[in-house]
Amino acid sequence: MATTTVSPGSPGAAWRRVGAFCLDVLFPPVCGGCGRVGVLLCPACVVRLVPVAGPICLCCGRALDRAADIAGGLCRDCAATPPLLAQMRAPLRYAEPASSLIHRLKYEGCFALGPALAGVLIDGWPRWPSPPDLIVPIPLHPRRRRQRGYNQSELLARPLAAAVGVGYSATALQ
């Protein structure tokens, strides 16, 4: 996915703002969580997003609820078979409205939700126990990438890495 950088004060940036305004008038954004017209992620749905909190697996980021797991710092799965990646994090529990937002991003082609969800990741960044050296989107199978036309995890990982000042690589896992 190629990106073009346009300086904020340039004529190109002004035309992009005009174009975005026209698109919003013709096709107003709709909240991915509840369908409210006018915004991609409404304040009511943002409030309903449940962050992963409390003790989490130091490897995969899954919530730990057993005393034995909490003491060891790893969930049962990671203790039995450690993943190839050193750290993975899920900032939200996969419950409504997060599950609807992710479904719309992945399967309904609503890639405009990418920046809104990336904002949720950026807001949750201070809760992450240790910052990684590199942020890497999970690659899609080439056939799936052709079908969708984009990798939804890239839409989240790239702006997160830029906002928090951590390196980014779309090809590290390929």
Task: Outline where the language-model segments fall.
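Glycine-rich phosphate/pyrophosphate-handling loop used in enzymes and phosphotransfer proteins
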Residues: 1-174
